[in-house]
């Protein structure tokens, strides 16, 4: 892990070396990172993949910094340890930058706190850069009922660097035809043998589901997709199977896969994975109790690796094909959803997964969540239907990231 320190020092202080004047802070940073000093005149030689901090080494550099405004890293992270009047200069610089719409932050104080903050900023930077250039396949088209889940492809690319790629379902149908039952026999046996039970569905249904999985994965490889969202209900009309098993296994393979052509939710899944390394469970808030502050999240697919055990079921709405009833571990969870046509809004909360439910009138994988914030959000100010649940409390990590990217938090 490398930090590029862009150094600004007054000519009045050049007789004192940067290293000796700031030994304490530099030695501490070097315990965790490789530090490369970059003269401010050379900062334009750095690439967008380089993590940069502006090192305010002395006072008297205020005008020098603003003269290089166009080349400064964004956001502007100013390191000032207090030596050589550096804090005084950093205060002036930060105020000037923020007055011109640039996010700015001063790193100063206890060494341990500075290091923790650098860790957070570095992880945010790495996550943001990892999103850049990612291709999200939109296989088919968004479901007609997702009227509030649109994304403007161009605005999303400008903000996040991601690319939504439209792929016709005919590509999947063609690959599906080429896959034979014999090719998927072993995979079907593996999924069936590890299931806790099989309540509905036939061997033929499972074979079709596995052929679909192979077809989608092949297209993902051909299109170099990091993620996809599938128009799964239209599949049922054409090939008489659901996408539940395919999406489950694709997520286990590391290909982020969402349902119903939901453009906002698949980005949420991708961003969450970039920041935390965790896969999410995309689900419908199916029951909401604002008095007890509980909700039930439900959907017919979940990554098998997210479950403790799973049961093979059929699809709830159509009673066709194969769905997954995952039994998920109890404990702390995070609920998140990115919204807005340019993905500049988000909802974020935490809670406790208290039980796996088994209602007959909702999707197969069901979990009850006791929320740490008012569940009234879902009734009064929701960001659409689908929300993402991941195991663990990642509120601070996710909030820091979206705030740093000028997103508006909805509560």
Q: What is each of the regions a protein language model found here?
A:
Residues 62, 86, 144-146, 234-239, ...:
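Flexible loop/turn segments at secondary-structure boundaries
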Residues 255-355:
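C-terminal catalytic subdomain
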């Amino acid at each position: 892990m490398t930090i590029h320190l862009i150094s600004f020092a007054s000519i009045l202080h050049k007789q004192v070396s940067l290293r000796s004047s700031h030994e304490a802070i530099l030695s501490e940073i070097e315990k965790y990172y490789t530090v490369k000093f970059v003269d401010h005149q050379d900062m334009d030689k750095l690439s967008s993949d380089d993590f940069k901090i502006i090192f305010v080494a002395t006072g008297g550099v205020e005008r020098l910094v603003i003269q290089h405004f166009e080349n400064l890293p964004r956001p502007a992270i100013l390191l000032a340890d207090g030596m050589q009047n550096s804090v005084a200069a950093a205060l002036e610089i930060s105020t000037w930058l923020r007055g011109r719409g640039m996010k700015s932050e001063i790193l100063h104080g206890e060494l341990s706190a500075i290091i923790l903050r650098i860790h957070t900023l570095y992880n945010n930077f790495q996550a943001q850069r990892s999103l850049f250039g990612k291709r999200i396949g939109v296989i088919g088209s968004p479901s007609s009922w997702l009227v509030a889940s649109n994304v403007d492809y161009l605005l999303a690319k400008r903000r996040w660097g991601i690319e939504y790629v439209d792929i016709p379902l005919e590509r999947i149908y063609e690959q599906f035809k080429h896959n034979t039952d014999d090719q998927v026999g072993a995979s079907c046996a593996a999924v069936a043998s590890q299931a806790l039970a099989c309540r509905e569905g036939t061997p033929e249904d499972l074979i079709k589901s596995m052929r679909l999985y192979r077809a989608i994965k092949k297209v993902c490889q051909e299109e170099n997709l990091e993620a996809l969202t599938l128009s799964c209900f239209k599949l049922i009309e054409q090939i008489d199977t659901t996408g539940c098993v395919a999406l489950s296994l694709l997520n286990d393979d590391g290909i982020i896969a969402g349902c119903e052509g939901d453009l906002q939710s698949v980005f949420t899944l991708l961003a969450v994975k970039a920041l935390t390394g965790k896969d999410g469970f995309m689900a419908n808030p199916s029951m909401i109790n604002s008095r007890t502050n509980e909700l039930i999240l439900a959907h017919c697919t979940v990554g098998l690796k997210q479950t403790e055990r799973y049961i093979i079921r059929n699809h709830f709405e159509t009673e066709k094909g194969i769905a997954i009833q995952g039994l998920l571990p109890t404990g702390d969870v995070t609920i998140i959803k990115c919204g807005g046509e340019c993905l500049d809004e988000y909802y974020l909360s935490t809670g406790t997964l208290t039980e796996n439910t088994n209602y007959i009138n909702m999707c197969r994988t069901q979990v009850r969540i006791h929320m740490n914030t008012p569940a009234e959000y879902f009734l009064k100010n929701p960001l659409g239907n689908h929300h993402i649940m991941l195991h663990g409390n990642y509120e601070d990590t996710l909030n820091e990231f979206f705030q740093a990217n000028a997103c508006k938090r909805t509560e």
